[in-house]
């Protein structure tokens, strides 16, 4: 074999090796999809939204079936890691594994690296975003997130149009880039409605964030979200926007209203979380994971899979379209004026209204966006602090 021929053979061998890692073999006509849920599958919040999203995909994509493990967190499963539990899904036949929490980031990367033949979806992550801060070259992984920022803005509008005291509380989970930007989005929506729809001075809007320390209550570890919600209501905050995975805010609002106190709440994540407090829930910003998971499953089956990062927005023709919109807002008990304001705001967003535009300062007074400057995706995704005008911690102590 001459030198040129040897080089050609070597190149083909290297290419074949690269291709094997570049894309797992297509699953073909049948695909078992496993999902790891950080909380209970029926938590009426984040985990149920992702569980239902996969259920939607299974119903839409012939040849697929589902296996799952829930309560994947240190409190419920001490000494057990997410990657170990992912192994258990593979042992049940899973050729695709979904990690459903930002808290699983390191474990998702560890598992994907060790299982190059398994398709991996990391919900809410950025590890496959080439321009992001946490990029890993993982050809078998796709990261998916919905642009919840829009829906949190809508929640802020609903809160600002409803509050009688001008005091809005935000019940936050742990502090990270995601939770900062979502709390800030709610503030931006509230600020916009307070000034432009209610024509009130911004100085009279009180927006306070209290973090509990995790996505849901872990007795003895986190602050109790029930107590935090109560503290808001007992301190004159008459609307509480939830940023945690579970429904304590709206449950407490219902209790307070039953005792004669006029308060409201806005749950999160799951479309039907609104049912936890009929009459006190102003609406719920929710994720609709099904369509994007269905697309990923089809790609894994037919060989069109490519590693990428996606940050999916709403379908502005109908933000609640179950087959097209990645995020939505399920309106609740809103006054006529508040409901009209929410509809008006959604229409403005659909036409291009951008609240992530300067002038905007960070909480410490430093400039975030100059006048007229629109934030980039990176500036929003990696928001380093809360915004000026918001009360509460910006970083973990």
Task: Kindly give the residue locations of the regions a language model identified.
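A residue-level marker of the well-folded mature domains of exported/periplasmic proteins
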Residues: 23-397
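Bacterial N-terminal signal peptides that target proteins for export
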Residues: 1-9
């Amino acid at each position: 074999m001459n030198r040129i021929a040897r080089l050609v053979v070597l190149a083909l061998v290297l290419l074949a090796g690269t291709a094997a890692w570049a894309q797992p073999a297509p699953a073909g006509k049948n695909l078992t999809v496993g999902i790891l849920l950080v909380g209970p599958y029926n938590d009426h919040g984040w985990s149920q939204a992702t569980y239902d999203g996969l259920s939607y995909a299974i119903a839409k994509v012939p040849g697929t079936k589902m296996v799952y493990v829930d309560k994947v967190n240190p409190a419920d499963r001490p000494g057990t890691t997410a990657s170990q539990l992912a192994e258990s899904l593979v042992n049940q036949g899973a050729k695709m594994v979904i990690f459903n929490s930002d808290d699983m980031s390191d474990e998702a990367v560890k598992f994907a690296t060790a299982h190059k033949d398994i398709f991996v979806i990391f919900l809410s992550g950025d590890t496959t975003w080439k321009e992001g801060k946490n990029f890993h070259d993982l050809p078998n992984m796709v990261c998916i997130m919905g642009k919840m920022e829009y829906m949190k803005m809508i929640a802020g509008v609903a809160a600002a149009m409803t509050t009688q005291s001008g005091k809005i509380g935000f019940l936050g989970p742990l502090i990270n880039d995601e939770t900062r930007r979502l709390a800030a989005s709610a503030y931006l929506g509230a600020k916009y409605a307070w000034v432009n729809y209610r024509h009130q001075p911004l100085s009279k809007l009180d927006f306070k964030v209290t973090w509990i320390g995790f996505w849901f209550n872990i007795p003895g570890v986190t602050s109790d979200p029930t107590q935090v919600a109560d503290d808001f209501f007992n301190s004159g905050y008459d609307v509480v926007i939830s940023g945690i995975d579970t429904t304590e805010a709206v449950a407490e609002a219902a209790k307070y209203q039953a005792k004669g106190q006029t308060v409201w709440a806005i749950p999160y994540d799951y479309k039907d979380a609104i049912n936890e407090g009929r009459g006190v829930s102003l609406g719920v910003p929710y994720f609709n994971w099904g369509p994007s998971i269905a697309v990923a499953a089809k790609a894994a089956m037919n060989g069109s899979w490519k590693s990428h990062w996606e940050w999916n927005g709403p379908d502005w023709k109908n933000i609640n379209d179950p087959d097209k919109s990645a995020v939505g807002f399920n309106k609740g008990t809103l006054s006529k004026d508040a409901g009209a304001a929410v509809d008006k705001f959604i229409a403005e967003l659909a036409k291009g209204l951008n609240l992530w535009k300067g002038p905007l300062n960070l909480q410490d007074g430093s400039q975030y966006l100059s006048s007229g400057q629109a934030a980039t995706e990176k500036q929003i995704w990696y928001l380093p602090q809360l915004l000026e005008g918001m009360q509460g911690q910006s970083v973990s102590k």
